[in-house]
Amino acid sequence: MLIKNFFIAFLMFFSILVHAENKFIVKDIQFKGLKNFSQNEALKNIPFRIGSTISQYDVKNSIKSLFKTGKFEDIKVSFLGKTIVFNIRERPIISNVIVSGNHIIASSVLDPYLKKLNIETGKSFNNFFTNVLTKTIKDFYLDIGRCKPDIKILKIFSKNNSVSIKILINEGTEIKINSIKILGVQAFSKEKILSLFKLQDYHSWWNLLSKSTYSPKELNNDLEHLKNFYLSNGYYYFNVNTKKVDFLQDKKQVDITIGVSEGKKYKISNFFVNGNLFPYQKLITNLININPNEFYNRDKIDIIVNKITRFLSEYGYVNTKVIVDPQIDHKKKTIALNFNIDMKKRYFVKRIYFTGNEITQDRVLRRKIKQMEGKYFNTKLVELGKKLLEKTKYFSDVKIIQKLNSYDSNQIDITYQVKEQTTGSINFGLGYGVDSGTSFNLAFSQDNIFGSGNSLKVDIIKNDYQKYLDISTSYPYFFYNNADLNARFFYNDFKYNFDNISNIIKNTYGFEGNLGFLINNYNKVNFGFGYTHNSINNEEKKIHGKFTGELNINKLYYFVGVDDTRFKKIAIPGDQIFIKVTILKSNKNILIFKNIAVVNNDIICKSKIVFAKKYLF
């Protein structure tokens, strides 16, 4: 036992010595073979520096890190004492890229793809990506039915370790469809079946929307469309048995022959909903709108499955699996459908994040989100938040990213990824008129000022006849989420010159305010208050005896209004017509108006009732 313990201790001591000997302190780092890249740039891509204590493991990692840059073709490491020497062979630098022969693929489409593959001027050349490019372009031409396309990439290397790339594209020739035959069709006419195809033979001049050019991809799409047609009309066992494409002698035309078996039509005898679905069993059953003895319809069943998964996703079950298991009675030609539903875990939202909002404050976005943190995940509310963010017009794009916290967790983090866009404008004008003199105008508008979600508009006009200022601002969330405030301040001086009256100045200034409270998603109550001062002044104090001095009129008013933001659509004859009806019962007491718009055979109605009171003094 003593000998055994001594032997184990010896091995441990020996392994420590070996480990210590494998590590050393770096005295110097050298790079040989660098031409297009500096040594400092190379040093940034290795995990150690001069004076670091490293092992062989660190050296291997440094080689991997240098290769990841994509700038080096070969790397070998040697040691001179405690100096590490990297012997490097650089990849050539692409001096220019020339593409010719591409007529079907536009350069505006091809250039971004070349950039994605790093095939552009100034990048390191990698032969692997040119092979990927060749295969991708060739496959594209074959998919659209081009015969014998050819892609050649010429590489011209120079002495300064650069390469010029020329991409020569031969798009091949177009293949026409000589004939399409479908064998085995009995339930429908040949014309009906062929009308389902986008591909048509070139003799079918009557079908203007068809394509007479052969495309393998388009043919597969047509066959899938044909299968869906049969499966949606009760033919449960329909199948495409054969697909044959024969090239004619000139290789410019093909004959297409399709063999199908229709089978018999099947009806649905009954359906059953299976699974631990409490308390949603009845609600889910109501979503399945299948009547006994109606023909089997795969499209309808797919829609029902989507409705079920969508419904449960609004209650936190985001990974629901619905499997439709048919029980077939071949004798009666009936099918009983079993909707086997596994709701799985119920998820709730842990955190909601926002990214991309460099200007807009988080709180501006968060108040638009209806899904709450700590509540069960609701697809409807999450998507509604996206729509409301888009409705602000602050963002050109809004994306939703869902991330599970962990595999075993039932928590989801939601990220709204936004892309901000310009929400304001400034217009400036300067001119000169014989009567008005030098004229200056400024218009400023900003809908999301300082990222606060508030808006500000300023209009200024100044010339010899007029001094005009109008400032309006809007606070969509003034007190809390259901209250908004709109305010306006205005000032206007306008000078009139008539034949027998001169230097008459009309002066107007005042303010307006409106406070709105949202009652529900559709109705809002508005309370408004305003003041306007109007005066007419004669600078010369004399207007041929008609008027001397000053006339003042002040108006103070308030109003209460009810808005209905719902739009009612009723289809009627008519197109692109707009009708507006305004009814004034009293100019000083009650104002009632109603707008009706007719657009594309629909009536869009927005109604508003306002009770107003005015005081003049």
UniProtKB/Swiss-Prot annotation:
Which residues does the UniProt record annotate as the domain POTRA? Answer: 24-91, 92-172, 175-263, 266-344, 347-421
Q: Which PROSITE patterns match?
A: POTRA
CC annotations in GO = Bam protein complex
GO biological process terms, semicolon-separated: Gram-negative-bacterium-type cell outer membrane assembly; protein insertion into membrane
Keyword terms: Cell outer membrane, Membrane, Repeat, Signal, Transmembrane, Transmembrane beta strand
Cite a single Pfam family from the UniProt record: POTRA
Q: Which cysteines in this chain are paired by disulphide bridges? A: none
- Signal peptide extent: 1-20
Q: Where in the cell is it found?
A: Cell outer membrane
Q: What InterPro entries has UniProt attached to this entry?
A: Bac_surfAg_D15, BamA/TamA_POTRA, D15-like, HotDog_dom_sf, OM_assembly_BamA, POTRA
Q: Which family does it belong to?
A: Belongs to the BamA family.
**Which PANTHER family does the UniProt entry name for this protein?**
OUTER MEMBRANE PROTEIN ASSEMBLY FACTOR BAMA, SORTING AND ASSEMBLY MACHINERY SAMM50 PROTEIN FAMILY MEMBER
Q: Function of this protein?
A: Part of the outer membrane protein assembly complex, which is involved in assembly and insertion of beta-barrel proteins into the outer membrane.
Its quaternary structure? Part of the Bam complex.
| Protein name (record) | Outer membrane protein assembly factor BamA
